[in-house]
Design a protein with these regions (language model features):
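Extracytoplasmic metal-acquisition and chelation regions
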Residues: 1-244
Length: 244
């Protein structure tokens, strides 16, 4: 809390993403400026799903629809939304530190250019792919991503915050989907043991690849200096394989 109180700028994606941040965003913390990225972008975030304690017995394909006007809270998984996030943060930095505004703007332009290239890469992968469906063996944080690139998806669990294990019937249905659609690759999430993916691969002969949500990184990843762009470019290569 002391660090928060001494901060010139306190940033969050949105209240419905970092539900724990409400107290930190109370003006009594004394931080200099408060930046709610989603609000500044004019986005209304859907409530972040809570953990489910029970195993799931249905795979999820476009099952959960948000209230009209709301978007999934994981906005950074969409490279176009990510560009908006960079612009909002840059504007805040320029207000706080106008002396270095040109420095921030220059770096922002360079980074946004890289995000635009990333977006173009995903569009190319989808345009040249043999299929338009991807399969996730665990939790799912890519609704904005799949909507941006007009991809269908099947996921074993319907929420990123869901820590339950998919049930046997769910796994069996996904195995059938992989076989029927000739899916070459299924995805698993970072920082988890891909047990479900291993089962599906064992039954179908498909490969499994990491599709990183860029939500958290391991200590090794952090120490190696990975960032959003490197993780998403890895996702791009894995997506090309999955759509081949």
């Amino acid at each position: 809390m002391k660090a928060v109180g001494n901060a010139d700028l306190l940033i969050r994606v949105g209240e419905n993403m970092e539900t724990w941040s409400a107290k930190l965003f109370d003006k009594s913390t004394g931080a200099g400026e408060y930046l709610d990225i989603a609000s500044e972008m004019g986005l209304r975030l859907a409530a972040h799903e809570h953990e489910n304690e029970h195993g799931h017995e249905d795979e999820h394909e476009h099952e959960h629809e948000y209230e009209e006007g709301f978007v999934d809270a994981h906005i950074w998984t969409d490279p176009v939304y990510a560009q908006g996030m960079v612009k909002v943060i840059t504007d805040a930095l320029c207000r706080l530190d106008s002396r270095n505004a040109e420095f921030y703007k220059s770096n922002s332009e360079k980074y946004i250019s890289k995000l635009q290239s990333l977006d173009a890469g995903f569009k190319d992968a989808v345009r040249n792919g043999k299929r338009d469906i991807i399969v996730f063996s665990g939790r799912f944080a890519f609704r904005n991503f799949t909507e941006r690139y007009s991809l269908k998806f099947v996921s074993a669990l319907d929420a990123c915050a869901d820590n339950s294990e998919p049930g046997a019937r769910t796994v069996a249905k996904i195995i059938d989907t992989v076989k029927n659609e000739n899916i070459p690759v299924i995805f698993y999430e970072e920082l988890t043991e891909p047990r479900t993916a291993e089962i599906i691969c064992g039954e179908t002969g498909c490969s499994m690849r990491l599709f990183h949500s860029c939500h958290n990184v391991s200590r090794d990843e952090f120490e190696s200096g990975v960032g959003y762009l490197s993780l998403m470019n890895d996702n791009l290569q894995n997506l090309r394989e999955a759509l081949s």
